[in-house]
UniProtKB/Swiss-Prot annotation:
Residues that bind ATP: 9-10, 14-17, 92
A single GO BP: FAD biosynthetic process
Reactions the enzyme catalyzes: FMN + ATP + H(+) = FAD + diphosphate
Function, in words: Catalyzes the transfer of the AMP portion of ATP to flavin mononucleotide (FMN) to produce flavin adenine dinucleotide (FAD) coenzyme.
EC category: transferase
Recorded metabolic or biological pathway in which this protein acts: Cofactor biosynthesis; FAD biosynthesis; FAD from FMN: step 1/1
Assembly and binders: Homodimer.
Naturally occurring in which organism (per UniProt): Archaeoglobus profundus (strain DSM 5631 / JCM 9629 / NBRC 100127 / Av18)
CDD domains tied to this protein: cytidylyltransferase (cd02170)
Needed co-factor(s): a divalent metal cation
Protein name: FAD synthase
Gene name of this polypeptide: ribL
GO MF assignments: ATP binding; FMN adenylyltransferase activity
Family: Belongs to the archaeal FAD synthase family.
Stored InterPro entries: Archaeal_FAD_synthase (IPR050385), Cyt_trans-like (IPR004821), FAD_synth_RibL (IPR024902), Rossmann-like_a/b/a_fold (IPR014729)
Length: 155
């Protein structure tokens, strides 16, 4: 059985995430997803959605056999425990495939690192674009939203 591991923040799930996970699943028999801990997200703003909720949503996705939270202190710890045959990286993930493979070999793992080049093309295939869209809509309709939330005792 070929075990594939994919990692990511998965803050606001969108079609790009789904495509990445579908492509990762095609690489093997079992797909385990490591969801980044909030404190370990450094290459972009902190996630909006709490980590426990992100892992729950990811675990419910069709291509995913299991989703777990990453380790707070050592990003390699869950990988060492899972011993994957393949690590799937998204087209835009900030890892160098060769350096990652070298690091895994130093740790005794013979894991292949595969860059998924497939990319879903859609207007909101980015959590950042979705957040920007929400901010823009809220700004343009601020009074309407304030009245809505006040009428429900939420402000």
């Amino acid at each position: 059985m070929v075990r594939v591991v994919a990692t990511g923040t998965f803050d606001i799930i969108h079609p790009g995430h789904i495509r990445f996970l579908e492509e990762a699943k095609k690489l093997g028999d079992e797909l385990i997803v490591i969801v980044a801990r909030e404190k370990n997200v450094r290459h972009k703003p902190k996630p909006i959605i709490p980590e426990e909720q992100r892992v729950r949503v990811v675990s419910a996705l069709k291509p995913v056999d299991k989703a777990i939270l990453g380790d707070e202190h050592d990003i390699f710890k869950p990988i060492m425990e899972l011993k994957p045959d393949i690590i799937a990286l998204g087209y835009d993930q900030h890892f160098d495939e060769k350096k990652l493979e070298e690091e895994l070999r130093k740790r005794g793992l013979n894991t292949r690192v595969v860059r998924i080049k497939a990319k879903e093309e859609c207007e909101y295939c980015s959590s950042t674009k979705i957040i920007k869209r929400i901010v823009d809509v809220v700004k343009s309709r601020l009074q309407e939203y304030e009245e809505f939330f006040r009428s429900r005792g939420m402000l």
